[in-house]
Amino acid sequence: MLVYQDILTGDELLSDSFPYKEIENGMLWEVEGKNPSGEEGGEDEGVDDQAVKVVDIIDTFRLQEQPSFDKKQFVMFMKRYIKQLSPKLDSENQELFKKHIESATKFLMSKLKDFQFFVGESMEGEEGSLVFAYYREGATDPTFLYLAYGLKEIKC
């Protein structure tokens, strides 16, 4: 099994159990989350109304929700993140990262009001990567976006 860790914090954020699709020139990974408790159709007879509904990715990787960002806060976060991450990339990836991160940032900013923000379980929001979750129109399960260059692949 492959696990993907945040390069900056070491937090596990994703595994190969969750297929991803590269978007924005490979800068972002898009992953479909599931709400297993909401997958069973039919009547809710005997189901506790107080039951907590969990999303698989959030639960599996113990992601911690963060307060929303406004545009200014998000730009500040991205500038800091780029500055922290760039030196950790090899020269080839640094070039690709610098070439495409601006368009990926603009893409994320266009959806900013729709996002829920998450960090890894260490809650190093100032130091690590963000995971973005949003619901597509009509969807009951969230879609997650990961900053791909901030992930390190580890074999387990």
UniProtKB/Swiss-Prot annotation:
<dbReference type="GO" id="GO:0005634">
    <property type="term" value="C:nucleus"/>
</dbReference>
<dbReference type="Pfam" id="PF00838">
    <property type="entry name" value="TCTP"/>
</dbReference>
<feature type="domain" description="TCTP">
    <location>
        <begin position="1"/>
        <end position="156"/>
    </location>
</feature>
<dbReference type="InterPro" id="IPR034737">
    <property type="entry name" value="TCTP"/>
</dbReference>
<protein>
    <recommendedName>
        <fullName>Translationally controlled tumor protein 2</fullName>
    </recommendedName>
</protein>
<dbReference type="GO" id="GO:0032502">
    <property type="term" value="P:developmental process"/>
</dbReference>
<keyword id="KW-0539">Nucleus</keyword>
<comment type="similarity">
    <text>Belongs to the TCTP family.</text>
</comment>
<dbReference type="InterPro" id="IPR018103">
    <property type="entry name" value="Translation_control_tumour_CS"/>
</dbReference>
<keyword id="KW-0963">Cytoplasm</keyword>
<dbReference type="InterPro" id="IPR018105">
    <property type="entry name" value="Translational_control_tumour_p"/>
</dbReference>
<dbReference type="InterPro" id="IPR011323">
    <property type="entry name" value="Mss4/transl-control_tumour"/>
</dbReference>
<dbReference type="GO" id="GO:0005509">
    <property type="term" value="F:calcium ion binding"/>
</dbReference>
<comment type="function">
    <text>Regulates proliferation. Induces whole plant regeneration when expressed in heterologous systems. Involved in root growth and lateral root development, with a probable role in cell reprogramming. The long-distance transport of TCTP RNA and/or protein in plants may have an important role in regulation of growth and development.</text>
</comment>
<dbReference type="GO" id="GO:0042127">
    <property type="term" value="P:regulation of cell population proliferation"/>
</dbReference>
<dbReference type="GO" id="GO:0005737">
    <property type="term" value="C:cytoplasm"/>
</dbReference>
<dbReference type="InterPro" id="IPR011057">
    <property type="entry name" value="Mss4-like_sf"/>
</dbReference>
